[in-house]
């Protein structure tokens, strides 16, 4: 992987710090490592920009660990434009921003052009070029870290009512109903476009990778609906790693042998994080499974000692959640014939 600059290294350290704190919190909180409490998914305040899955989990952990009412974030420059400022001694959270401002000829690496020049080319010429991705690290601040609550109390309170924790909102019943509808819609779309889902009478939720089938008990068999949702989302994420979908290393069985133990533990980390992202979109807190709880120290150590792991996590979590989004949009997720 490309060598990180100092800013990227500092961002990675901050991300690892947030994950480590979250895993430690899980030990004290019956496995809950991302207490979402009904907050809507992370977003940039007053901006209609898509937030990647990995950025979303980083922002979500930051909001949860600091007890913020919403997952609404802003740039320092944007706050300034609105007549606000970041409060003193507040520490931002890293947001990974990708640009494709330069393009290179697929047949001649010396031939590079700007984005504007690329867009001016006819479509048949554009096919000869591919984008060069560059990464920037931006610092974001939760709106509670700014002076918004004081400068424009009305706007702040309206934002909390629309995006905040259930305990801070007036429409609790409607919000709770929306959460259930979100889960059922996800399952319907996934069943229709990605993977077969069957009811399981044994009471044990599981994914059969050989048959590519999810077996899920009825919601009524769970004491808490949130646990049903967690099992459902976790199994959907697991299914994205199938050898004929994203083919994550920890999911692949070669010559009848399972992946190495480290790969299996890494797959478990990817599954838990991607599951948390999707649950966060639904407004549900993420809870580690008992099997995952025993891996938290290993994950924390590996994230700290292996600088490449945070990048692998970003890539695989983004890919898994993007695949679920594709199914939700009504696009078919076909199995790849090549394994």
Regions found by a protein language model. Name each.
Residues 1-339:
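N-terminal accessory/interface modules of nucleic-acid-binding and processing proteins
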């Amino acid at each position: 992987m490309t060598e990180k600059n100092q800013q990227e290294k500092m961002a990675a350290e901050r991300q690892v710090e947030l994950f480590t704190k979250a895993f430690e919190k899980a030990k004290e909180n019956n496995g809950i490592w991302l207490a979402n409490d009904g907050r809507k998914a992370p977003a940039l305040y007053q901006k209609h920009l898509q937030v990647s899955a990995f950025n979303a989990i980083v922002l979500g952990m930051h909001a949860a660990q600091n007890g913020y009412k919403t997952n609404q974030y802003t740039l320092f420059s944007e706050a300034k434009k609105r007549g606000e400022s970041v409060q003193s001694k507040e520490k931002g959270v890293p947001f990974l921003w990708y640009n494709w401002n330069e393009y290179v000829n697929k047949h001649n690496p010396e031939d590079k052009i700007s984005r504007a020049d690329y867009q001016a080319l006819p479509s048949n010429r554009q096919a000869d070029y591919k984008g060069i991705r560059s990464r920037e690290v931006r610092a974001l601040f939760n709106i509670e870290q700014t002076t918004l609550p004081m400068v424009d109390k009305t706007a702040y309170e309206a934002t909390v009512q629309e995006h905040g924790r259930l305990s801070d909102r007036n429409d609790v019943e409607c919000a709770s109903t929306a959460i259930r509808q979100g889960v059922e819609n996800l399952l319907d779309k996934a069943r229709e476009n990605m993977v077969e889902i069957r009811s399981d009478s044994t009471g044990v939720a599981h994914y059969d990778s050989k048959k590519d089938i999810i077996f899920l008990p009825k919601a009524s068999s769970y004491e808490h609906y949130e646990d049903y949702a967690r099992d459902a989302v976790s199994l959907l994420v697991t299914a994205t790693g199938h050898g004929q979908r994203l083919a994550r290393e920890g999911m692949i069985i070669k010559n009848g042998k399972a992946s190495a133990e480290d790969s299996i533990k890494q797959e478990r980390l990817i599954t838990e994080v991607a599951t948390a992202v999707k649950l966060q979109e639904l407004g549900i807190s993420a809870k580690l499974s008992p099997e995952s709880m025993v891996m938290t120290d290993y994950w924390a150590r590996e994230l700290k000692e292996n600088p490449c792991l945070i990048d692998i996590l970003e890539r695989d979590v983004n890919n898994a959640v993007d695949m679920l989004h594709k199914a939700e949009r009504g696009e078919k997720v076909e199995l790849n014939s090549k394994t």
